[in-house]
């Protein structure tokens, strides 16, 4: 089997191939200097940046080609002012934050309060001599900050713009950011179309891997690409021996002529029951395998690392209520998919009215159901304030994998997902398992 793995990098001043080479080195469990013994660097004929290569590994899953969706060059022209305004807005509107981010907010408030208390105590204790000291220190206080500002302005600007600026521009659909968001998504869709429309049909499956902000981009790409393809995804419901939870969702449609059969409780995955999650994931793969020859959809897996989607109620919507509305209206795909009717029966089929004004039932997956056949695995470090579990927001069919045995308390854990052994072991499980698993 030959598969393609697409890596989507996160925030920061990334350079082309920087994330891809480090990721492949971590997954293979070797230093980058040893990679030349096991991989082939080949031209990337799909991306148009002229800066990228694809790394081909022959030992794993027969053959795996690693691609990088590089988007940093599209994120230019960011200034620090709107980024700081966004940060201040969140600081002074804690009600907009979820529970995990509110802990960070309380930490910032505690630091600011401690500084204010320390200055007050200093004034009360040393007040009498403070007047004399002010005569000397005021000029220094006037000159010093200007010197420090001149010295550090470049670094502060780089820190704010180069890191937080990426997240601000992609996650906020303000008018100045719309073109940037569109350019990044267009580049990703072009890559996915190229992999699917390859004349040689080299790949049997495609896996998307997104780190940090790259996981949000990967989620968006699956959403938009599925909307292009879903009308061509027609289900085969005749294979009686391989009925799955997904096909039973279709067959229990209240729109069917016969009385709808109720869904069994075991058909619905539960985050409290890992076996039910694994059963659902198996059914996703069975459905894909049963329809593989006719499916125009090769993306079998989404793997997210340190994903800010764990804060989707803050970053993608204005609170949990609006996120729920978006999911119910299938603007935000979930796993399992939301049904098409208000009775929450998991309806995945649709009726069309043709030119003859006759209703024709077509068994297809609706435009918000990519995770009927695409599995979602989410890896996170418990200490990572950016990443975290996502199944509580996007559905119990997602496999959340906490990486608690290493790097569990490090504040730098967000950038350690392919640098620690336990994380790389989970990555290998997600990327190189058999297609039937």
Where are these regions (language model features)?
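Lipolytic serine-hydrolase domain surface
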Residues: 10-13, 18-21, 25, 29, ...
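Active-site catalytic motif of lipid deacylating hydrolases and related acyltransferases
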Residues: 13, 60-108, 128-202, 414
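Short, flexible coil/linker elements and helix-boundary hinge sites characteristic
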Residues: 29, 126-127, 143-144, 154, ...
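Acidic/proline-rich low-complexity IDRs
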Residues: 49, 118, 129, 262-265
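Low-complexity, intrinsically disordered/propeptide-like segments
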Residues: 53-55, 137, 266
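Canonical alpha-helical transmembrane segments of integral membrane proteins
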Residues: 103-123
């Amino acid at each position: 089997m030959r598969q393609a793995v697409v890596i989507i990098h996160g925030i920061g001043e990334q350079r082309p191939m920087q994330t891809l080479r480090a990721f492949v080195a971590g997954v293979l469990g070797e230093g980058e200097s040893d990679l030349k013994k096991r991989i082939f660097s080949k031209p990337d004929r799909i991306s148009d940046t002229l800066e990228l290569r694809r790394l081909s590994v022959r030992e794993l899953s027969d053959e795996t080609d690693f691609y990088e969706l590089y988007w940093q060059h599209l994120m230019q022209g960011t200034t620090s002012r709107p980024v700081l305004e966004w940060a201040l807005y969140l600081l002074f509107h804690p009600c907009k934050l979820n529970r995990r981010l509110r802990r960070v907010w309380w930490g910032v408030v505690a630091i600011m309060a401690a500084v204010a208390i320390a200055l007050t105590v200093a004034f009360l204790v040393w007040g009498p001599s403070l007047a004399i000291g002010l005569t000397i220190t005021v000029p220094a206080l006037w000159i010093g900050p200007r010197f420090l500002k001149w010295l550090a302005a470049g670094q502060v600007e780089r820190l704010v713009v180069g890191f937080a600026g990426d997240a601000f521009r992609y996650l906020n659909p303000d008018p100045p950011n719309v073109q940037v968001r569109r350019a990044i998504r267009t580049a990703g869709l072009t890559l996915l179309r190229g992999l699917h429309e390859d004349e040689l049909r080299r790949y049997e499956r495609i896996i998307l891997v997104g780190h940090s902000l790259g996981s949000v981009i990967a989620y968006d790409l699956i959403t938009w690409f599925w909307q292009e393809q879903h009308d061509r995804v027609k289900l085969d419901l005749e294979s009686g021996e391989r009925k799955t939870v997904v096909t039973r969702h279709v067959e229990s449609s209240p729109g069917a002529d016969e009385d709808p059969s109720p869904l069994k409780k075991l058909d619905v995955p539960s985050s409290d029951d890992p076996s039910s999650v694994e059963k659902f994931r198996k059914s996703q793969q069975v459905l894909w395998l049963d329809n593989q020859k006719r499916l125009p959809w090769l993306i079998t897996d989404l793997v997210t690392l340190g994903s800010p989607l764990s804060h989707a109620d803050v970053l993608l919507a204005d609170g949990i209520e609006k996120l729920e509305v978006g999911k119910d209206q299938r603007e935000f795909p979930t796993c399992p998919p939301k049904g098409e009717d208000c009775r929450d029966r998991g309806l995945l089929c649709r009726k069309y009215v043709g030119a003859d004004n006759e209703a024709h039932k077509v068994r297809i997956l609706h435009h918000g159901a990519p995770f009927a056949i695409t599995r979602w695995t989410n890896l996170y470090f418990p200490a990572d304030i950016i990443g975290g579990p996502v199944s509580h927001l996007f559905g119990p069919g997602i496999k959340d994998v906490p990486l608690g045995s290493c790097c569990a308390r490090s504040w730098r854990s967000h950038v350690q997902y392919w640098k620690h052994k336990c994380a790389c072991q989970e990555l290998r499980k997600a990327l190189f398992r058999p297609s039937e698993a």
